[in-house]
Amino acid sequence: MNKNLLTVENLTMKFGGLTAIDNLSFSANKNEITSIIGPNGAGKTTVFNCLTGFYKPTYGEMFLNKSDETIALKKFTDFKIAQKAKVARTFQNIRLFPAMSVLENMLVAQHNELMIASGYSIFGILNLKRYKDKEIEAVKKAKYWLDIIGLTNRADDNAGDLPYGDQRKLEIVRAMCIEPKLLCLDEPAAGLNPKESSELNKLLEFIKNDKKTGI
């Protein structure tokens, strides 16, 4: 097997008698943007759902090649793929928590790390220094990304009150809080005006070049 960041081999997804993905193979490299192009209903979102554990493919394999190990994504559930393989995603329709603040949305992405630091115990949350330290670190990381997209001054506002383009960017940087090796974006520019699309392109170039994340 070669050492691409992502290797997909003969991926097939069937729903009863309907074949949504038929024997798809491709690879994606670190520090590059790889696009899956096709008309509505071609199965693009289904590919992402397989990669991120929402669906278990009928056939085929998906490998995430990290520097120290190769991970077979098919073996893991969705949250384990995010936690262990460091694969993150956004959705075709924005999936923020609109009634929570912008900052709270960023902290939700770091829930797994905070729970590990707590020892999965209410006593850990209340008393453990490591939990408090991790919480401070999580807020710092969240504010770093909010500064990148120019939303520091909106940190306490409800995410649902942001303009559409800012919500798109917020969803992307929320995903970046897990420090992913691979970031899957499902039609990230859908509904954006030219100015918002330009800002999105700059953000993705920064993620690709500065964070060395495959997109």
At which residue positions do the language-model features occur?
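Catalytic Walker B motif of ABC-type/P-loop ATPase nucleotide-binding domains
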Residues: L183-E187
